């Protein structure tokens, strides 16, 4: 029998018969590993324990201790178990697809009746019965004709269509347990009992079109979440409850920050309070960029298609652009313009004005650029996903040798900004060269090394995402962690030698010859709209004092105190504090409660005692106790708190 060589993570290699399965490999190492094994990685591919290995390969055996692989298998198996449970409860239901998604899975079903909350409970119960039965999960390769005949016989048109879409020279892999079969690439666990029965929950039902096309039949999508332990599930459900309380759409109404409406889908109507947050954040970012050596510019929002064709965006991005046709005098054809979906081609136009020398580099151009992208109506979500937004966008034009230092400076700036805004931890992911790419391996080596050196220079941790860079260069993605543990991808740093070439950007080098600069696309917030949504949810509306739209409300207890209230408000405003008076004929407790709902950080209550002592009674948001302070003292303190960081 032919032999193959399998190399393990420790670098040691062993000979095995060709066709051996990972399950057999695990058992050959130790009885314990044979029992604990759930899957393998073979040459980087996630591999079922039942699949044969025919050639030399690198292999790693996975157990439940391997978080990523374990969760993928648990969630994938639950998709199958749920689909089986649904068809056992309602045999007429047709099945389609059921992939793993973030935190869980979904499966799409064709059913005439709508799934109810009671139905979800019945499905969960049947799923737990299947899990507790510890039924073996088996797999087999079928010929295409056999798979089509199998699904046609059972009246499963969606599965027939899926099989027919698979190339004719490929075999069809089937998985089954308890007599229920599904078309699937795998891998899966070895028996249903390996799925934790107390660590999953069916969450919701939503509509979904077959293959995502609104021209096709509408299906019902059941979502589920799953984890390795019951405690992890409880923690996740608690996080969802907390997230619901912090929902920026709900708080946006309570704090009178913004609204959206059908006449302008995906476009934000900022109210005075929300616009104040926006402007304060913009002023903060403008100051930080100025300190870091950026020059602010402004470019047009409506640009002729010729520029988008030259940049390559027209071909690749046209479907997501807002097109504007204009009839101009004496023109034979209509002029076709587009609202810019990104700022980079316009920034190259600014760079191209006037001859540049190597002495002018690095040149850092920043813009709070207004962009528009056509997002599908189903994908829009409050401030988090909109069609009209403003980026804290900047592009650095530099030489290859300057990439490392510019990247390091950017990471330090980003880290400082996030810290000022209340985010002390973030993750960095380095996406490296894809298979299809431009440029030489030597050029990619230099740039990827420059980014890694920059990250190490600032002492940050990072992970590599192999093959996920753009076709023209590697990139860094920055994910911050909020107060309830959610991760948000906001910052980016993208190396681009392509756009300067397409749009003719040049500089004169030390050798007197013309060279192409590198263009570094970078953002810290991403978009103001989305980042403000993140801030609102991170702080549950209780924004830092300097960022709060209404920083202080000075409330009278009796009408005789109104003149002193006006004096206090004037003193605070003179020192840059956003202060308002509340002299309505309402009880002080009512005023305090109302302004607390509006998330005002400080309420100063004033009665005759405070008038006579020229003091104020200070109540801070979230606290029940009050503190008496002299007028000059409270003005000095609040003026200091109101200063924008940096």
From Swiss-Prot:
Alphabetized InterPro entries for the sequence: aa-tRNA-synt_IIb, aa-tRNA-synth_II, aa-tRNA-synth_II/BPL/LPL, Anticodon-bd, Anticodon-bd_dom_sf, Beta-grasp_dom_sf, TGS, TGS-like
Cofactor binding, per record: Binds 1 zinc ion per subunit.
**BP GO annotations:** threonyl-tRNA aminoacylation
Q: What is its EC number?
A: 6.1.1.3
Name the CDD domains for this protein: TGS_ThrRS, ThrRS_anticodon, ThrRS_core
Query: SMART domains from the xrefs?
Result: tRNA_SAD
Q: One Pfam family of this protein, by short name?
A: tRNA-synt_2b
Q: Where, by residue number, does Zn(2+) bind?
A: 344, 395, 521
Q: Where is this region: Catalytic?
A: 247-544
UniProt subcellular location? Cytoplasm
Oligomeric and partner information: Homodimer.
Which NCBIfam families does this entry report, sorted A to Z?
thrS
Q: Which family does it belong to?
A: Belongs to the class-II aminoacyl-tRNA synthetase family.
> What the protein does?
Catalyzes the attachment of threonine to tRNA(Thr) in a two-step reaction: L-threonine is first activated by ATP to form Thr-AMP and then transferred to the acceptor end of tRNA(Thr). Also edits incorrectly charged L-seryl-tRNA(Thr).
Name of the protein in question: Threonine--tRNA ligase
Q: Which organism is it from?
A: Cereibacter sphaeroides (strain KD131 / KCTC 12085) (Rhodobacter sphaeroides)
Tell me the lineage of the source organism. Bacteria, Pseudomonadati, Pseudomonadota, Alphaproteobacteria, Rhodobacterales
């Amino acid at each position: 029998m032919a032999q193959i060589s399998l190399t393990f993570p420790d670098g040691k290699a062993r000979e095995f018969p060709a066709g051996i399965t990972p399950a057999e490999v695990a058992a050959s190492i130790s009885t314990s590993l044979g029992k604990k094994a759930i899957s393998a990685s073979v040459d980087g591919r996630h591999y079922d324990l039942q699949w044969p290995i025919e050639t030399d390969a690198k292999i790693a055996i996975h157990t439940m201790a391997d978080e990523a692989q374990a969760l993928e298998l648990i969630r994938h198996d639950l998709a199958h178990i749920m689909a089986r449970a649904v068809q056992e409860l309602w045999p007429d239901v047709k099945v389609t697809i059921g992939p793993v998604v973030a935190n869980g899975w979904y499966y799409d079903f064709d059913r005439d009746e709508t799934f109810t909350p009671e139905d979800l409970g019945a499905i969960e119960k049947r799923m737990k019965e299947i899990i507790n039965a510890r039924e073996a999960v088996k797999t087999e390769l079928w010929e295409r004709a056999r798979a089509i005949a199998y699904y046609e016989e059972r009246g499963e048109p969606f599965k027939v269509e899926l099989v027919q879409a698979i190339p004719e020279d490929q075999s069809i892999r089937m998985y089954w347990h308890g007599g229920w079969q599904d078309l699937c690439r795998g891998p899966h666990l070895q028996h249903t009992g390996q799925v934790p029965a107390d660590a999953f929950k069916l969450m919701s039902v939503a509509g979904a079109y077959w293959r995502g096309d609104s021209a096709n039949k509408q299906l019902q999508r059941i979502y589920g979440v799953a984890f390795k332990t019951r405690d992890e599930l409880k923690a996740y459900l608690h996080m969802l409850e907390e997230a619901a309380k912090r929902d920026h759409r709900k708080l946006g109404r309570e704090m009178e920050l913004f609204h959206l409406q059908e006449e302008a889908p995906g476009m934000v109507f900022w109210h005075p309070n929300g616009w104040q947050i926006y402007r304060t954040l913009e002023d903060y970012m403008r100051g930080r960029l100025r300190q870091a050596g950026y020059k602010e510019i402004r470019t047009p929002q409506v640009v002729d298609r010729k520029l988008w064709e030259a940049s390559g965006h027209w071909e690749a991005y046209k479907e997501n652009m807002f097109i504007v046709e204009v009839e101009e005098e004496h023109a034979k054809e209509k002029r076709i313009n587009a609202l810019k979906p990104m700022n980079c081609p316009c920034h190259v136009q600014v760079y191209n004005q006037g001859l540049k020398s190597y002495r002018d580099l690095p040149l850092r151009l920043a813009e709070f650029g207004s962009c528009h992208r056509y997002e599908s109506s189903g994908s829009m979500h409050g401030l988090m996903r909109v069609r009209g937004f403003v980026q804290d966008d900047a592009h650095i034009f530099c030489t290859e040798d300057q990439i490392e230092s510019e990247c390091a400076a950017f990471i330090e700036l980003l880290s400082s900004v996030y810290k000022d805004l209340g985010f002390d931890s973030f993750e960095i992911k380095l996406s490296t060269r894809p298979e299809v790419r431009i440029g030489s391996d030597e050029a990619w080596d230099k740039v990827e090394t420059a980014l890694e050196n920059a990250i190490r220079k600032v002492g940050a941790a990072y992970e590599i995402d192999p093959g996920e860079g753009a076709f023209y260069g590697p990139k860094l993605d920055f994910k911050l962690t909020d107060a309830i543990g959610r991760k948000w991808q906001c910052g980016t740093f993208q190396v681009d030698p392509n756009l300067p070439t397409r749009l003719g950007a040049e500089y004169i080098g030390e050798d007197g010859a013309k060279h192409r600069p590198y263009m570094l696309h970078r953002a810290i917030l991403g978009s103001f709209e989305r980042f403000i949504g993140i801030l609102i949810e991170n702080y549950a509306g209780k924004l830092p004092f300097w960022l709060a739209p209404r920083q202080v409300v000075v409330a009278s207890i009796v009408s005789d105190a109104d003149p002193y209230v006006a004096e206090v408000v004037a003193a605070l405003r003179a020192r840059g504090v956003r202060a308002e008076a509340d002299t309505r004929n309402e009880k002080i407790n009512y005023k305090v409660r109302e302004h607390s709902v509006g998330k005002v950080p400080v309420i100063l209550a004033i009665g005759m005692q405070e008038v006579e002592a020229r003091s104020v009674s200070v109540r801070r948001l979230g606290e029940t106790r009050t503190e008496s302070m002299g007028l000059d003292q409270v003005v000095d303190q609040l003026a200091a708190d109101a200063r924008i960081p940096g």
